[in-house]
Amino acid sequence: MIFVYALLALVITFVLVPVLIPTLKRMKFGQSIREEGPQSHMKKTGTPTMGGLTFLLSIVITSLVAIIFVEQANPIILLLFVTIGFGLIGFIDDYIIVVKKNNQGLTSKQKFLAQIGIAIIFFVLSNVFHLVNFSTSIHIPFTNVAIPLSFAYVIFIVFLQVGFSNAVNLTDGLDGLATGLSIIGFTMYAIMSFVLGETAIGIFCIIMLFALLGFLPYNINPAKVFMGDTGSLALGGIFATISIMLNQELSLIFIGLVFVIETLSVMLQVASFKLTGKRIFKMSPIHHHFELIGWSEWKVVTVFWAVGLISGLIGLWIGVH
């Protein structure tokens, strides 16, 4: 059945994207490009966004099919809730952006409050209503040591889900970058899940992986469609949730290393400018810095994918030991 889920997720996305693109163009749901960004990006103005709707719909449909046949499908139900929750926040943000024809959307406060709400509901559904059971301790790799957090684990979950949701969002600035890194990440978590005996989570990772594979051909340079916040916020939230449900939170640092680096580059840039009036990078997130020093967009993407693959394998090794 795993092959069926994979094929279904792949086909649905691959078929939906070319159907959605003309609809988005007709509705003028095109991406606005930052004027201060690399000049090479200006030609992307008007490229349809909100393409994440295609793979999210594929994930929802395929997951509902899987829930019927998979024993102990509660993990899939919970992951589906997170997918829809974070995806809905991204959809609202995208909708406001394309209607107003600017790069604003939801305010930071509105977005954070909504993300925090989804994270808290996730914790309540899992640990209060016991849809799934996972430890409220952080396990240290290669040891039998676990750091109990008790109630503070709620804060940790919120930090991880909200932080990683926005990390993937920041990374989604080059054609295919976030999509490719997510494919690598879900591949690692799929293998990890099956090795750890978490079959339902593994199946969901397979669904994620193949839904994104169906989207990638339309998203690589030159992109015919962008996933938008609809896709990126959902992907980040799912990554964090999977690491939490596997009790392998620290593996996320490596499996999502490029996302972490991208986020840190923004934080360092802002802090440096506020404290010294000088910028560390030519532009942040850091993928734009490499563009501005002369790298082609495709070179940045492939190098970042390679880094993601190597760090992902390290994260996988950590997770299964």
Curated annotation (Swiss-Prot):
Enzyme class: transferase
Membrane topology: Multi-pass membrane protein
Pathway: Cell wall biogenesis; peptidoglycan biosynthesis
Catalytic activity: UDP-N-acetyl-alpha-D-muramoyl-L-alanyl-gamma-D-glutamyl-L-lysyl-D-alanyl-D-alanine + di-trans,octa-cis-undecaprenyl phosphate = Mur2Ac(oyl-L-Ala-gamma-D-Glu-L-Lys-D-Ala-D-Ala)-di-trans,octa-cis-undecaprenyl diphosphate + UMP
The entry's keywords: Cell cycle, Cell division, Cell membrane, Cell shape, Cell wall biogenesis/degradation, Magnesium, Membrane, Metal-binding, Peptidoglycan synthesis, Transferase, Transmembrane, Transmembrane helix
Function: Catalyzes the initial step of the lipid cycle reactions in the biosynthesis of the cell wall peptidoglycan: transfers peptidoglycan precursor phospho-MurNAc-pentapeptide from UDP-MurNAc-pentapeptide onto the lipid carrier undecaprenyl phosphate, yielding undecaprenyl-pyrophosphoryl-MurNAc-pentapeptide, known as lipid I.
Any single Gene Ontology cellular-component annotation: plasma membrane
Cellular localisation: Cell membrane
A family per Pfam: Glycos_transf_4
Biological process annotations from GO: cell division; cell wall organization; peptidoglycan biosynthetic process; regulation of cell shape
PANTHER family, alphabetized: PHOSPHO-N-ACETYLMURAMOYL-PENTAPEPTIDE-TRANSFERASE (PTHR22926), PHOSPHO-N-ACETYLMURAMOYL-PENTAPEPTIDE-TRANSFERASE HOMOLOG (PTHR22926:SF5)
Lineage: Bacteria, Bacillati, Bacillota, Bacilli, Bacillales
Entry's family note: Belongs to the glycosyltransferase 4 family. MraY subfamily.
Transmembrane domains' residue ranges: 1-21, 50-70, 76-96, 112-132, 140-160, 176-196, 200-220, 225-245, 250-270, 300-320
Entry's EC annotation: 2.7.8.13
Keyword NAD found: no
Known cofactor(s): Mg(2+)
GO molecular function, one term: phospho-N-acetylmuramoyl-pentapeptide-transferase activity
Keyword NADP attached: no
Protein name as annotated: Phospho-N-acetylmuramoyl-pentapeptide-transferase
